[in-house]
Amino acid sequence: MIREFISPGDPRWREVLDRAVHDVYHLPEYIVHAAKHEGGTPLAFYAQAGGEFFLVPVLKRPLPETLGDSRPLCDASSPYGYPGPLTNCDDPERLELFFAACVEAASELQICTLFLRQNPLLSLPELRLGSDVDVTSHGPTVYVDLAQSDQQLATNVRSGHRYEIRRLVKEGFCVVMDEWQAYAEFIKSYAKTMHRVSASERYYFSDDYFWDLKQQLGPWLHFGAVRTSGGQYVAGSLFTESGGIVQYHLSATVDEFHRKSPTKLLLQQAIGWARQRGNRYFHLGGGLGAQEDSLFRFKAGFSKNRSTFSTMRVVVQSAAYGELNRRWAQQNPRTPLQAGFFPAYRQQAHPVSGQAA
């Protein structure tokens, strides 16, 4: 078996994508963009045995300096989105060998832990991966099967959504795909939308993030805008398109129009657009933190199809991981380790209720 971590410029990365059903999150261009804005070194674990392959895009990051560890350790994680392992192997035993090879190569690279976000549409089957690997299911996501007929697609849309879409059309709102003239307005409205919904910090992005995303992804990125009958921009969404999968990436609505829910019209039109272009799936994603919240219920109004979002938490070097967690706990005695947070030593320090910082 050939197995090693490769860089985005390695031709084998592109060869895998040419042979496999994949998503935009597997593209080297996406990982490069993520590295710039999330931090870390863009890499992918690559393994090949016979005609089978296994690819896992990650960002390799140095350990937090506050831990004061002098060893050349680091960790690796999936970037924002749904990269996850990509393979053409469907045999559980051989997949387990591929995964074991990934852990071995990570250890040789002094990677202490791996945090992998699986793609809900391309997840691995259930595997026996040992006690140092935890596979956690977080919740459902919503997707549209674009192989369905127009009638089936329309029937799957919740009646309340259909009513509001008809009202928007009657009032003269319209959708234009790839109208990049409104992109700057979208970027401004995105920040205001995040403020309005009290989004957590990780959902805020700089202006450079958006412009770099457009430059880096090029034809794989699409922008849909909603305008009034008078031409005023009121809402916009970013979509990615790769490997027959369209992802609903980011969305925003101008404050004064958010009660009209123009994004419902935008998504209905975008689903039809994606189907006309020959795509297989339109993935709307899930709720915040994969919860079945108001965001999830909004998305669920477009389709009855569900998939599951899960993560893989891998302790590559258990002794080092235990030591790093102990060191973190000593440095932050007022903050209990949060169950389920991985890797634990990257948890932000917050005093327990009633204690001063």
What is the predicted role of each segment?
Residues 81-92, 147-148, 251-260, 288:
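A short, internal acetyl-CoA/4′-phosphopantetheine-binding micro-motif in the GNAT/acyltransferase core
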Residues 60, 127-152, 279-357:
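Active-site/acyl-donor-binding loops of N-acyltransferases
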Residues 114-115, 176, 281-285:
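Short catalytic-loop micro-motif centered on adjacent basic/acidic residues
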